[in-house]
Amino acid sequence: MATRGWFSESSAQVAQIGDIMFQGHWQWVSNALQATAAAVDNINRNAYPGVSRSGSGEGAFSSSPSNGFRPKRIRSRFNR
């Protein structure tokens, strides 16, 4: 069959070209994802200080003085 020989020959070339195109596209995608992640990290660090460093306890969301006594005050009001 002539069609089968042509298909086997062209499919190998298409696979090779597609592999090269996929490698280039994946490199571009990974670069774009890394740039987006860096930009999002930079925006979060500038807009919400302490969100990326919430583990050390210096965030406005993680450590505020009202979080220390408000649950105790509500519980003591119901427990007396």
Swiss-Prot record:
Magnesium listed as a keyword: yes
Predominant subcellular localization, coarse grouping: other
Chain residue ranges for the region called Disordered: 49-80
InterPro entries on file: Bchl_c-bd (IPR001470), Bchl_C-bd_sf (IPR038387)
Keywords noted in UniProt: Bacteriochlorophyll, Chlorophyll, Chlorosome, Chromophore, Electron transport, Magnesium, Metal-binding, Photosynthesis, Transport
Propiece residues: 54-80
Subcellular location per the Swiss-Prot or TrEMBL entry: Chlorosome, Chlorosome envelope
Domain of life of the native organism: Bacteria
One Pfam entry name: Bac_chlorC
Gene Ontology terms for molecular function: bacteriochlorophyll binding; metal ion binding
GO CC annotation terms, alphabetical: chlorosome envelope
Biased composition (Basic residues): 70-80
Binding, a bacteriochlorophyll c: H25
A single BP term in Gene Ontology: photosynthesis
Notes on the domains: The C-terminal extension may have a role in proper incorporation of the BChl c binding protein during chlorosome assembly.
Main function: Component of the photosynthetic apparatus. The light harvesting B740 complex binds bacteriochlorophyll c.
Family the UniProt entry places it in: Belongs to the BChl C/E-binding protein family.
Protein name in the entry: Bacteriochlorophyll c-binding protein
Protein source organism: Chloroflexus aurantiacus (strain ATCC 29366 / DSM 635 / J-10-fl)
Lineage: Bacteria, Bacillati, Chloroflexota, Chloroflexia, Chloroflexales
